[in-house]
Amino acid sequence: MGALTIVAKYMIVAQIEVNGSVDKSDIIGALFSQTEGLLGKDMDLRELQMMGRIGRIEVDIFEKNGKTKAKIYIPSNLDRYETALVAALVESIERVGPYPASVKVIEIRDLREEKRKKIIEKAKELVKLIEEEILPDTKEIIERLKEDVAKAEVVEYGPERLPAGPDVDKSDAIIIVEGRADVVNLVKHGYRNVIALEGISRGVPQTIIDLSKKKNVTVFIDGDKGGELVLKELLKVAHVDYIARAPPGKEVEQLTAKEIAKALRNKISLEEWLAQQKASGERAEAPPQPAQQPQQEQPAPQRPIQAPFDLEKKIEEMLGTLEAEIYDQNWTLVKRLPVRELPDFLATSGDSIYAIILDGITTQRIVDLAAKKGVKVIITARTGPLTKVPEDMSIYTFEQLKKTE
């Protein structure tokens, strides 16, 4: 069993049987894709993982006679009712890739049992202490507890000693906020994978830049002009996946638990944010290349793409849709989907992919995922900062193709 990624209350242990040969990523992909939306956004596995309410899903897999069996481990920081719902949700999986599958929850372990025993023993000692010692003032105790909890929960992260929640390293996704007060508020309401910029007057901390390269990043900004300025500075040097915003006129540190949850549920992708900026009449530019990494320029197309349809008409059809189309080697349409779902599709799909046309921004993350799938052609509205493009992959912008028609 793999290491836990959160301080969990429960461990869901399930067994899956697949009538075919699959790997771990196929099983995990099926868990996310087939349960999405079944119980609403509050119980969506991706949302729960982003908030640190469930941990990294681990799979122990073994194959025999062309069939695959595996054990699935899901650490949960939810209450027992919500944990039971997640377990039942997992049992709803019916396929992995093209193969029929069945899932059975074996057990739900209470990981806090040992801790309870220790607490009871300690409580017995403290009862004796209370009887023997004069109790201090109640208000003083409460103030001490508040101070100790605050100090224990918010840690200093990286060489810049940035304020952060305790689960930044453990979680696959992080929430970036502006200041320490924002971190304290989010940690207080259960979001432990949060870290602060601590202002941008001296530039974006290198720790934030490094974290953005290896984790899924949501930037949570204040609902004022200052929040937008912070975001634009961050986009110059860091990779951002999603943007969440406090209600107009409010700061993140002022939000209630309900307001925080709503803002994070309503987060949008970077591509959607740029499209909104453009639609509202603001000049929205793609994030420029970080200074420490020279940007690789895309050459203009040297030869026309041999597609069996009019590319210029296709581009006109795609403009404004914020969607992507996936094609195989014969330029047969495999799938059409929102651009925000493209990274997950590339990471989990078993389809053969030759070309992608998308009304959005092609980021380095999309290029990396596409390269793993053997994609040869990407036609995109715009490109973000690209530092590494495979030699056998061609990337064309809509403008480039219009010029060559």
Swiss-Prot record:
* Residues where Mg(2+) 1 binds: 178, 222
| E.C. numbers | 2.7.7.101
Keyword annotations for this protein, in alphabetical order, are:
DNA replication, DNA-directed RNA polymerase, Exosome, Magnesium, Metal-binding, Nucleotidyltransferase, Primosome, Transcription, Transferase
Query: What is the protein's name according to its record?
Result: DNA primase DnaG
Q: Which parts of the sequence bind Mg(2+) 2?
A: 222, 224
Q: Where is the Toprim domain?
A: 172-248
Task: Spell out the family assignment given in the record's similarity comment.
Answer: Belongs to the archaeal DnaG primase family.
The keyword Transcription is annotated on this UniProt entry: yes
Q: Which Gene Ontology cellular component terms are annotated?
A: cytoplasm; DNA-directed RNA polymerase complex; exosome (RNase complex); primosome complex
Question: Per the record, which residues fall in region Disordered?
Answer: 279-303
Which superkingdom, per the lineage? Archaea
Q: Per the UniProt entry, what species is this protein from, by scientific name?
A: Pyrobaculum arsenaticum (strain DSM 13514 / JCM 11321 / PZ6)
Q: Where is this chain compositionally biased, Low complexity type?
A: 292-303
The biological processes this protein is annotated with in GO are: DNA replication, synthesis of primer
| NCBIfam families documented for this protein | PRK04031.1-1 (NF003108)
- Catalysed reactions, semicolon-separated: ssDNA + n NTP = ssDNA/pppN(pN)n-1 hybrid + (n-1) diphosphate
Note describing how the cofactor binds: Binds two Mg(2+) per subunit.
- Assembly and interaction partners: Forms a ternary complex with MCM helicase and DNA. Component of the archaeal exosome complex.
The cofactors named for this UniProt entry are: Mg(2+)
Q: What does this protein do?
A: RNA polymerase that catalyzes the synthesis of short RNA molecules used as primers for DNA polymerase during DNA replication. Also part of the exosome, which is a complex involved in RNA degradation. Acts as a poly(A)-binding protein that enhances the interaction between heteromeric, adenine-rich transcripts and the exosome.
Q: Which InterPro entries match?
A: DnaG_primase, Primase_DnaG_arc, TOPRIM_DnaG/twinkle, TOPRIM_dom
What GO molecular function terms would the record report?
DNA-directed RNA polymerase activity; metal ion binding; poly(A) binding
